Amino acid sequence: PGWSFNSVVFKTLNGALNQGLKSFDDIDGVEELEFYFGNIDVRHHLCRLEGDPIKNTEALADRYIEQARELGAKIYELLPIENESRVVPKTGHYDGKPFWGSWAERKKVRDHFNDYIEYKYDIIRWTDYLLNDRGELDFAYMEKPRSIHLSREYYPHWTGVEKETMS
């Protein structure tokens, strides 16, 4: 109803930027464009790669901001980090591991990524209702029984949250 959704499963933000954000859909005539990428990069790469994870995060965010700005696109904040007890299917592993870095390290990277984009560009904040009392992504909002993905019924466009939180 007035919008479309293009899910690009298994695509990292880094991979999307290398390919070019404008390559993901026919955007001619699109009035409003929004992107959500980055959780795979936090889960598997930013705490694993050589160098300072925060500097690596900022470099990735700068590339994201540059391409989003060129397209006049909005950026959604990253999902919170779920508890490490979540059993992740092997398709969600990288080099045999469900994640790289501790929960606290990945949360720090995720929070910095969101804050940095908000400071340098703009970001759509929408995930507070997805948190449990420990500040983790609550399993209740994730695909069942085991997945690293948010259940579609909790996507912003399904719930109307995006219109309430846009600045």
Residue ranges and their predicted role:
Residues L21-R152, G160-K163:
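Alpha-helical cap/lid subdomain in secreted, periplasmic
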Residues P1-V30, E118:
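Serine-esterase "nucleophile elbow" of acetyl-processing enzymes
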